[in-house]
């Protein structure tokens, strides 16, 4: 058989991000069979145990490369890490939905939350040479504490101007189709980089901009021509 695109054993070599959907399917099955039947107290206990397990996995660097970006290939570490990475925030989200009480004052929640996420996403890899992974500490803290607080704060706010409302609606609509269609175009971009040996921003920004623009346009077309019509048809069954 021909070698996969990047040659690193991806679970879904033609569209890498599908690995997370694989675990989401498992999460939905577990929810239907078990989690939805749990009391809020038992759900809290389960969520706490999963948070502890995820922290252990991240801080002790079980992945071997100081990150919990795991689940994308089929081996023991990635299956375990992928399950923890999915079940921990999944159960936390269900618990939050049961206990959610919006903040009274959450003005500018959209812009504040967006700015906070932008800052977090620009934090570089935190190197450490000890027994514990500092980058794992940071990632676990984001998953267990920071991101849930951002979701809570953002969900407490309401967009009051036309621009914010349109931006939020567009980002919400486009997020799923963009996630699932962008990677094949990124593969093409990678192959272009390797073939042309152009690596600097000055050399690559036109191709990078074209790849991003094509991904957004393709996602929008999938949303309008496939996703929305299929959802409408399913609702009418």
Please provide the spans of the model-predicted regions:
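Hydrophobic alpha-helical segments with transmembrane-like composition
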Residues: 1-58, 218, 222
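Aromatic-anchored segments of alpha-helical transmembrane domains
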Residues: 1-2, 49-63, 115-127
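Alpha-helical transmembrane segments in multi-pass integral membrane proteins
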Residues: 5-8, 34-38, 69-216, 232-237
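Intrinsically disordered, low-complexity segments enriched in small/polar residues
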Residues: 23, 174-177, 224
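Acidic active-site catalytic centers that drive phospho-/nucleotidyl reactions
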Residues: 24, 182, 227
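Primarily interfacial, aromatic-capped hydrophobic alpha-helices that serve as membrane anchors
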Residues: 58-75, 218-224, 228
């Amino acid at each position: 058989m021909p070698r996969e695109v990047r040659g690193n054993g991806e679970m879904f070599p033609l569209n890498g991000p599908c690995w997370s959907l694989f675990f989401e399917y498992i999460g939905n099955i577990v929810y239907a069979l078990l989690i939805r039947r749990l009391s809020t107290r038992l759900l809290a206990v389960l969520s706490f145990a999963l948070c502890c397990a995820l922290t252990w996995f991240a801080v002790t660097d079980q992945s071997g490369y100081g990150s919990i970006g795991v689940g994308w290939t089929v081996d023991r570490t990635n299956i375990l890490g992928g399950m923890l990475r999915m079940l921990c925030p999944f159960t936390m989200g269900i618990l939050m939905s049961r206990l959610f009480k919006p903040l009274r004052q959450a003005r500018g929640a959209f812009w504040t939350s967006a700015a906070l996420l932008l800052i977090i996403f620009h934090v570089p890899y935190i190197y450490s040479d000890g027994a514990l992974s500092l980058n794992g500490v940071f990632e676990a803290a984001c998953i267990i504490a920071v991101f849930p607080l951002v979701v809570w704060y953002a969900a407490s706010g309401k967009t009051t101007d036309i621009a914010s409302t349109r931006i939020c609606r567009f980002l919400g609509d486009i997020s799923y189709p963009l996630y699932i269609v962008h990677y094949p175009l990124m593969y093409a971009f990678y192959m272009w980089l390797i073939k042309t040996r152009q690596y600097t921003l000055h050399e690559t920004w036109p191709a990078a901009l074209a790849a991003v623009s094509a991904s957004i346009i393709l996602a929008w077309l999938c949303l309008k021509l496939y996703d929305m019509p299929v959802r409408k048809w399913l609702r009418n069954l």
